Amino acid sequence: MPVADTSQLTSGVAERYASSLFELALEHGAVDSVTADLDRFQAMLDESAELKRFVASPVFSAEDQLKAIVAISERAGISGFFANFLKVVARNRRLFALPGMIRAFRLIAANHRGEISAEVISAHALSQAQETELKAALKSVTGKDVTISVTVDPSILGGLIVKVGSRQIDTSLRTKLSTLKLALKEVG
């Protein structure tokens, strides 16, 4: 069952929640542990289609979402600020915005460290060598250290889509084929 695109709606919510979590973690010197828990939870989201559907679905009650999030957090070894944060998000029925909250937290943390964060979409998982090479290329362009967040999307067919701040570089095969298709329509 497709879920409506709520990306525009959630960006403000996600940024506010992420900012609150970051400020709390910074105040208590727990940014690294929150980041580790956040990464662990993101890995679970990436690996589980059921968890993605659960997070995005408005069908479950706040109580059911809270119980599930508590169980998932305990099983994954997520505790402290991030576990409490997940409970608040579930209680407030904002789990649908969780992926945006994770992205926003990473951006805030990277900015705090003087780094630039880049979102990378690839058709296939990147090797460590490819990630290192991409970071070096982005550092040479931006002049700052770059942290990258890689998302795998087979629908782009090949190449990469790289988003750094308000700039986007799209070298995906899908875009190149679309451009070629348009060019052929104009000729024909």
Swiss-Prot record:
Pfam families: OSCP. It is found in: Cell inner membrane. The keyword Cell inner membrane applies. InterPro entries: ATP_synth_OSCP/delta_N_sf, ATPase_OSCP/d_CS, ATPase_OSCP/dsu. Belongs to the ATPase delta chain family. It comes from Rhizobium etli (strain CIAT 652). It is a peripheral membrane protein. Keywords: ATP synthesis, Cell inner membrane, Cell membrane, CF(1), Hydrogen ion transport, Ion transport, Membrane, Transport. Its main location: membrane. One of its GO terms (molecular function) is proton-transporting ATP synthase activity, rotational mechanism. This is ATP synthase subunit delta. F(1)F(0) ATP synthase produces ATP from ADP in the presence of a proton or sodium gradient. F-type ATPases consist of two structural domains, F(1) containing the extramembraneous catalytic core and F(0) containing the membrane proton channel, linked together by a central stalk and a peripheral stalk. During catalysis, ATP synthesis in the catalytic domain of F(1) is coupled via a rotary mechanism of the central stalk subunits to proton translocation. Signal peptide: none annotated. The gene is atpH. GO terms for cellular component: plasma membrane; proton-transporting ATP synthase complex. F-type ATPases have 2 components, F(1) - the catalytic core - and F(0) - the membrane proton channel. F(1) has five subunits: alpha(3), beta(3), gamma(1), delta(1), epsilon(1). F(0) has three main subunits: a(1), b(2) and c(10-14). The alpha and beta chains form an alternating ring which encloses part of the gamma chain. F(1) is attached to F(0) by a central stalk formed by the gamma and epsilon chains, while a peripheral stalk is formed by the delta and b chains.
